[in-house]
Amino acid sequence: MGEQEVVVPLVVVKMLEGRSVEQKRRLVRELTNVVMKYTGATEDQVDVMIEDYSKENWAKAGVLFYDK
């Protein structure tokens, strides 16, 4: 038989820019804990990516957040 495949959980957070590094640290820690709890993954297996977007690059209901 072959080797067992390891699936690494990846959480991608897309949000408007403006959060502090400390807020992002807390978010990443909490997300990692939740993923470990519900998937059985170890801490080293959980990846979290944060993608910050400016208000001129995000819209809701046809209106840029920049214009709100």
Locations of the language-model features?
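A domain-level signal for the structural core that forms small-molecule/cofactor-binding pockets
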Residues: G2-K68
